[in-house]
A protein has these predicted regions:
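Conserved, mostly hydrophobic/aromatic
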Residues: 29, 139, 198, 225, ...
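Substrate-binding/active-site clefts of carbohydrate-active enzymes
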Residues: 140-205, 211-337, 358-364
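Active-site-proximal helices and loops of the catalytic beta/alpha 8
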Residues: 242-251, 259-260, 265-276, 330, ...
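Conserved small/polar residues in nucleotide/adenosyl-binding loops
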Residues: 532-538
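Aromatic/acidic polysaccharide-binding cleft in carbohydrate-active enzymes
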Residues: 443-471, 490, 497-529
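Hydrophobic faces of well-ordered beta-strands that scaffold small-molecule active sites
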Residues: 135-137, 206-208, 252-254, 342, ...
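Aromatic- and glycine-rich beta-strand/loop motifs that create alpha-glucan
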Residues: 33-78, 89-102
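Non-catalytic, glycine-rich low-complexity segments
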Residues: 1-35, 109-110, 115-129
Length: 542
């Protein structure tokens, strides 16, 4: 007998997947004739609502001698998530059609269970056209290329690593702290020098990890949003990078770090670098004081995941919101420099109101501006801080970092069951709005994950420490096997819906476990040439 319902087949549900508000959905269920169903109802509720609404099915004939067909329509008129299921009144009492694990195949049960998700997004929601069919390339600026230009730096509290091919400093200092203060001096002019290389690879978008002034080499501890870090160059260097990239048909997007700043910043100024009596830590009359959440000023304050160097900001503070999203704020200023959009760090920690304001700022400057959020799970039904998030409903993000696809692809390459992998992929395709699917940021590696080659071919990390990670290197046989499997992974990456993203150096055979081993410098002149085709859309022809 056929299954009663399958939400991923258009025989049972049209249209497939997420829908615009006001779209009528036609549903069909198949029921055993010997169940003697007297009435069938579609049960629907809006997200967190407690009350279910019921819509009657009509009997529409028989599928075969043992199966009958029932059909109904439903029209969601409000954006958000809906949950639906099926209630049957039969000769034998109440029965329910419910999704059953592990592959979403439905069964008829005597009690209600899980429901199916329906995503309803804003009518007219569109996403930028330019990412479609292109390739994104992620660059950690300190580690991609050094232009050779020496900077006139006033800062002295950092370590310059003169061996481009060395491991980043991974051991703690004498105080037991990891300071991330070793720099390889990669810069914006160095990226500009390599634009021809990126164009040749087929890159259409560069995603830059943070470039604003900061203490650390990763620059997620912003010191001054308005200035490019002097080690990277100047604001003019960024303007020139965007202009030169545009000549080659390449867009540039920046990393927006707006859930926290650095403690060593002009805004907080714990260390006094920006003056003796400035910043929220040193002056309660500071214009930035209201940005932060002090329990007991100055030393007891909210910080990101307990890191005292990353004080959290109150994103709903009017002064902070104006500074970032205002008419002359940071978002618009960089868009005017030539920036084509933003990747938002820890998007699940940014309030809806803030992201709505940011979207308005971006789209007013450039209707084709691209906004990507860092979300590790299914972003359509993500909850954070006790609330359902509205990332993909047409009022906040255009796209998210698609870690669900990444995990599924790499799991498959490591031998995971194909049905399980397919279910992970199809759940995203079913739950995400079509405008989002076409621009999903599909990465196999990022600055926050192990390199794809290491995941596929190396020993599992299994919580091993940095000492162990520092001493690992793939053997010849591991690398050979990893090459073949990486081709498979990239083939999937390029053929699934979305905007494939290459993490710098993956195409050159870089390996590495967790930070900082996944952040080594691009191996110019030492590339593993068998990998250089991996960013090309012709991967399946190789």
């Amino acid at each position: 007998m056929p299954v009663p319902f399958d939400s991923q087949k258009i025989y049972y549900r049209t249209p497939f997947g997420a829908v615009e508000e006001g779209t009528t959905i036609h549903l069909r269920i198949l029921l055993p004739r010997d169940l003697h169903t007297q009435r069938a109802d579609l049960a629907v509720k809006y997200d967190y609502d407690y009350n279910w609404e019921y819509f009657g099915f009509f009997w529409c004939g028989t599928f075969d001698d043992a199966t009958e067909i029932w059909e109904a329509d439903f029209t969601p008129n409000k954006i958000g998530l809906y949950w639906y299921g099926f209630k049957l009144q039969t000769k034998y009492g109440l029965r329910y059609i419910v999704p059953s694990d592990p592959y979403n195949i439905s069964t008829i049960e005597t009690s209600p269970g899980r429901s199916w998700q329906l995503t309803c997004y804003k009518k007219g929601f569109t996403t930028p056209k330019w990412p479609v069919g292109g390739v994104m390339y992620q660059i950690l600026p300190d580690r991609f290329n050094f232009s050779g230009e020496e900077k006139n730096l006033t800062r002295t509290d950092f370590q310059r690593n003169t061996d481009w091919y060395a491991l980043p400093q991974w051991w703690p200092n004498e105080n037991g702290e990891i300071t991330n203060s070793d720099f390889f001096m990669g810069d914006l002019k160095g990226i500009t020098q390599k634009l021809d290389y990126l164009e040749e690879l087929g890159v259409s978008c560069i995603y830059l990890n943070p470039i604003s002034e900061a203490y650390s080499n990763h620059r997620y501890d912003t010191g001054d949003y308005s200035k490019v870090d002097p080690i990277l160059g100047t604001n003019e260097d960024f303007i020139n990078l965007c202009a030169e990239a545009k000549k080659r048909g390449i867009h540039v997007i920046n990393d927006g770090v707006y859930s926290h700043t650095g403690s060593d910043s002009k805004y907080f100024n714990r260390n006094g670098r920006y003056g003796e009596n400035t910043g929220a830590y040193r002056d309660q009359n500071s214009p930035y004081y209201s940005w932060y959440k002090f329990n007991n000023w100055p030393n007891d304050y909210h910080s990101w995941w307990g890191f005292y160097t990353l004080p959290e900001v109150n994103e709903t503070d009017p002064k902070f919101n104006e500074y970032i999203n205002g008419k002359d704020g940071i978002v618009r200023t960089y868009m005017r420099y030539g920036n084509s959009g933003w990747r938002l760090d820890v998007a699940d920690e940014l309030p809806d109101e803030f992201m709505e304001n940011l979207r308005k700022a971006v789209k007013e400057e450039d209707p084709e501006g691209f906004i990507v959020g860092e979300v590790w799970e299914d972003a359509s039904n993500k909850e954070s801080y006790g609330a359902r998030r509205k990332f993909l409903l047409g009022e906040e993000l255009d796209s998210v970092m698609n870690y669900v696809f990444r995990n599924a692809i790499l799991d498959f390459c490591r031998g995971a069951d194909a049905k399980y992998v397919m279910n992970q992929i199809m759940s995203v395709i079913e739950n995400y709005p079509r405008p989002v699917l076409r621009v999903l940021m599909n990465s196999l590696s990022t600055h926050d994950t192990e390199r794809a080659l290491t995941v596929i071919a190396g020993e599992p990390l299994n919580g091993r420490d940095r000492q162990w990670q520092a001493n690992q290197k793939l053997s010849y046989d591991q690398r050979k096997r990893g090459t073949a499997l990486l081709k498979l992974a990239v083939g999937m990456q390029y053929t699934l819906p979305g905007f494939p993203c290459v993490y710098y150096g993956d195409e050159a055979g870089l390996e590495g476990y967790r930070d900082p081993f996944n952040r080594c410098c691009y191996p110019w002149g030492r590339e593993a040439v068998s990998y250089t085709h991996l960013t090309l859309p012709t991967i399946l022809l190789v």
